[in-house]
Amino acid sequence: MKHLTEEQKLTLDMVRDVATREIAPRALELDEKSLFPEYARDLFAKLGLLNPLLPAAYGGTEMGVLTLALILEELGRVCASTALLLIAQTDGMLPIIHGGSPELKERYLRRFAGESTLLTALAATEPAAGSDLLAMKTRAVRQGDKYVINGQKCFITNGSVADVIVVYAYTDPEKGSKGISAFVVEKGTPGLVYGRNESKMGMRGSINSELFFENMEVPAENIIGAEGTGFANLMQTLSTNRVFCAAQAVGIAQGALDIAVRHTQDRVQFGKPIAHLAPVQFMVADMATAVEASRLLTRKAAELLDDGDKKAVLYGSMAKTMASDTAMRVTTDAVQVLGGSGYMKENGVERMMRDAKLTQIYTGTNQITRMVTGRALLFP
């Protein structure tokens, strides 16, 4: 495991302070009222955190995957929805970074430089295309100097608030995975219709929207890469995203563990703090062990991505699976440690438990990530 640089340490100290002072006090309200974290968006923009992977060539800070993973862990510790804001922002930018032409990058990436508050989204999931993304029904037909897109997407994070959306659609359905293309779509494009924002179990401070495309015309120059390269582009983005999901999950688990530990030291039963009870000690020990193991695996995956190592896909899938399962288990155990208090909203752990569930689902369910891991090991 690499030692953190002084710059990374300073960034983390700053993020930890912001998370504790500015983000944590707002977490309960975001959850209860299902509010989009506009305050965090504006604050991150001023601090240079909203677009951490934006290349320096386009005015960005280009922090790297490991640094962003560390940031997401700190944010996830106090408010998973706010961490998801940065993950969604990165999701909509990575496809352009990975596959966009120099002209496309110049036209769009530079808009996110400085203190820009513009938001992005990635639109791939459909009602009939979740784990099986090749089942998507959205179509893009070339007509002269434009593409006409028809179809719909669902559960799109940042969907209704994004200024720039990367949309995946079939340009040649007969070619399967090599028939999918990706397009940059701007907010306000005629034919882009917004459906409902979903009411969710957890991560309620994040917006997930339905999007409909009704003869939506997109300039041909807005295609990302060549026709048919969209699926490979999407897989590359998801491989990176899984590490960020893992980091977020580690943060959620750490936050719940911190609350549980404090409670065991303060809560007195049978004449002494419950920290003295062996069953409680065993629970906390297992929780802490799982959190630290997940943290180390996640950081290893992030380092491999930064190094361009081919094993990053394998480690990213393992990290996402382990960290999200850990988050679900640790938050559930934290509720148990707190007992009746844990079931009440004011203590935060029940929110963390609801938030943790999503980490087992998005960027590929844990069943899918186990398949990715198994295939990478058995069919290298």
UniProtKB/Swiss-Prot annotation:
Is DNA-binding included in the keywords of this UniProt record? no
- InterPro entries membership: Acyl-CoA_DH_CS, Acyl-CoA_Oxase/DH_mid-dom, Acyl-CoA_Oxase/DH_mid-dom_sf, AcylCo_DH-like_C, AcylCo_DH/oxidase_C, AcylCoA_DH/ox_N, AcylCoA_DH/ox_N_sf, AcylCoA_DH/oxidase_NM_dom_sf
Protein residues bound to cyclohexa-1,5-diene-1-carbonyl-CoA: S131, K178, R242, T363, R375
Annotated residues that bind FAD are located at L122, A124, T125, S131, T157, T365, Q367
EC category: oxidoreductase
Which cofactors, if any, are listed as required?
A: FAD
What name appears for this protein in its UniProt entry?
Answer: Cyclohex-1-ene-1-carbonyl-CoA dehydrogenase
Phylogenetic placement of the source organism = Bacteria, Pseudomonadati, Thermodesulfobacteriota, Desulfuromonadia, Geobacterales
